[in-house]
């Protein structure tokens, strides 16, 4: 599902009118009707006699709200419109809908100053629902003055609130909120989701997101060159590797997982197990000689490979040649889980990666090794999938995690191009950037997954998918979705607070089966179905 900026959405609206002769007032009517239908579903078809307050600004978003008011009035709801502007200041299609609403006898109350707030505050005490139609996609900066006071008043009332297109006070392009912003119960956005609705903090303010068709021709959408997508179950289902009836384990990918060190054998075990559970045919865990026995006792299905080690028990520079020999026999490399930051291991990583020709999924201490010399990334290398969390990304760039979080999408996209690697930036709403400029945002996952070993599971899933022949970017995007969906299922069945990385392994097969069989149990947090 494409994600758009305010400018891109505005261009679609204009082209729908200029090239397809769809009047803008028709788009406004369709938008308002979709919100009304959503409200009807919310109340299970019973909107008659519901006390619904609609707060309208003076722009087109307010016009959408006036369409909502008209149709709810026709359906028997007790509607009050609070207008944050003088009627004579309303223009265009919004003015037309205001006049229709007034001719229908609808209640219109003006909010022109703080002295008018008391009546709205009292009405909120008895409201069944609030409709937020104050600001639209053109809003930038911070809500101030009267609009800010109204937004704060609505939030303090703690009434169920549906936002029209996006919560007022939220920037459509960035998801940032520099002043008060509506905390919506759910949001009905039009045609395509706006970027700011699916990245934090916007995603948390949006509530459940519904994407409504307002009649913009799909033929028109197909002519546009949008490079950002929201991952959906439908897209992920279409990317699943096929399992042939005549298939064998060699056909489904040979994965070499390199990592482990004293005290950190769990990380490489999780990654290797995840690769198998993601569908890989054969997985070998290559670890320091001193921990091979521990790993062999931990696992049954995973093969192990013993490698030379340093006096501290980490992988030594002498592991390079054995690894290169084994890499000639596998389809994908996963490197980093539990690897350690031993100086000899750091040197090993920097010498190994430029010589790897198969796709390599690079995580954890392998990323920390690259942070000591990023020339490995800017030089010649094979296909790479880098999977940093914000702290690891900050080390790669010599900055802070806070700076990374301020501009996650742009940073991921920039360095995916610069390093010619797939860059998966972990966090709430994980970003997957491809070297060609495409960016995917993953809606699955929850805070319970912020636990030791979760990233190791993700590394293994991606490697397992890449081993089955998926391109690195597809493997990373699909892997992120499956990883988060497994976490969501674990949260539903076991709760978030006590979640462990092993729970993700338990529920990954369940998620894969349901996705493959098109069972609609995978619903991304905050989103409706595809």
From Swiss-Prot:
Sequence ranges assigned to domain YjeF N-terminal in this UniProt record: 9-222
Reaction(s) catalysed (UniProt annotation): (6S)-NADHX + ADP = AMP + phosphate + NADH + H(+); (6S)-NADPHX + ADP = AMP + phosphate + NADPH + H(+); (6R)-NADHX = (6S)-NADHX; (6R)-NADPHX = (6S)-NADPHX
SUPFAM superfamilies: Ribokinase-like, YjeF N-terminal domain-like
Gene coding for it: nnr
UniProt-recorded name of the protein: Bifunctional NAD(P)H-hydrate repair enzyme Nnr
Cofactor dependency: K(+)
Cofactor remark: Binds 1 potassium ion per subunit.
Region (ADP-dependent (S)-NAD(P)H-hydrate dehydratase): 232-530
Chain sites annotated for binding K(+): 61, 132, 168
Lineage: Bacteria, Bacillati, Bacillota, Clostridia, Moorellales
Taxonomic source organism: Moorella thermoacetica (strain ATCC 39073 / JCM 9320)
């Amino acid at each position: 599902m494409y994600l758009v900026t305010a400018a891109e959405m505005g261009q679609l609206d204009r082209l729908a009118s200029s090239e397809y002769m769809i009047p803008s007032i028709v788009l406004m009517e369709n938008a308002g009707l979709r919100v009304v239908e959503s409200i009807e579903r919310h109340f299970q078809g019973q909107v008659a006699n519901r006390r619904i307050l609609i707060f309208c600004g003076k722009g087109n978003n307010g016009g959408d709200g006036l369409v909502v008011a008209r149709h709810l009035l026709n359906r028997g709801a007790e509607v009050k419109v609070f207008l944050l502007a003088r009627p004579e200041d309303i223009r265009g299609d919004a003015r037309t809908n205001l006049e229709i609403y007034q001719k229908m006898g609808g209640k219109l109350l003006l909010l022109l100053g703080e002295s008018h707030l008391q009546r709205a505050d009292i009405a909120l005490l008895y409201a069944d629902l609030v409709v937020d139609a104050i600001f639209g996609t053109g809003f930038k900066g911070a809500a101030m003055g009267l609009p800010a006071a109204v937004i704060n008043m609505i939030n303090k009332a703690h009434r169920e609130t549906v936002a029209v297109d996006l919560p007022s006070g939220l920037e459509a392009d960035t998801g940032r909120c520099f002043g008060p912003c509506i905390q919506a119960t759910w949001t009905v956005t039009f045609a395509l989701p706006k970027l700011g609705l699916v990245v934090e903090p916007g995603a948390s303010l949006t509530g459940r997101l519904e994407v409504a068709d307002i009649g913009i021709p799909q033929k028109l959408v197909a002519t546009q060159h949008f490079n950002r997508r929201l991952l959906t179950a439908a897209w992920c289902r279409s990317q699943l590797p096929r399992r042939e009836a005549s298939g064998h384990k060699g056909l489904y990918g040979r994965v070499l997982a390199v990592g482990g060190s004293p005290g950190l054998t769990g990380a490489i075990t999780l990654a290797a197990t995840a690769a198998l559970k993601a569908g890989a045919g054969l997985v070998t865990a290559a670890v320091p000689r001193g921990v091979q026995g521990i790993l062999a006792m931990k696992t049954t299905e995973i093969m192990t490979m013993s490698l030379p080690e340093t006096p501290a028990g980490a992988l030594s520079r002498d592991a390079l040649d054995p690894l290169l020999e084994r890499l000639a026999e596998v389809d994908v490399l996963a490197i980093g889980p539990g690897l350690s930051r031993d100086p000899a291991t750091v040197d090993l990583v920097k010498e190994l990666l430029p010589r790897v020709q198969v796709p390599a999924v690079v995580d954890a201490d392998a990323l920390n090794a690259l942070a000591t010399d990023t020339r490995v990334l800017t030089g010649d290398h094979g296909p790479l999938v880098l999977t940093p969390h914000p702290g690891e990304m900050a080390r790669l760039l010599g900055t802070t995690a806070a700076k990374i979080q301020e501009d996650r999408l742009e940073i991921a996209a920039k360095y995916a191009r610069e390093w010619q690697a797939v860059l998966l930036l972990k966090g709430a709403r994980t970003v997957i950037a491809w070297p060609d400029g495409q960016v995917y945002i993953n809606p699955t996952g929850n805070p319970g997954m912020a636990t030791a070993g979760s990233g190791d599971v993700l590394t293994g899933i991606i490697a397992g998918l890449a081993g089955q022949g998926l391109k690195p970017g597809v493997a990373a995007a699909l892997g992120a979705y499956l990883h988060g969906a497994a976490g969501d299922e674990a949260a539903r069945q076991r709760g978030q607070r006590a979640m462990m990385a092993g729970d993700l392994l338990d529920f990954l097969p369940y998620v894969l089966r349901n996705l493959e069989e098109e069972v609609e149990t995978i619903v991304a947090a905050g989103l409706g179905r595809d």
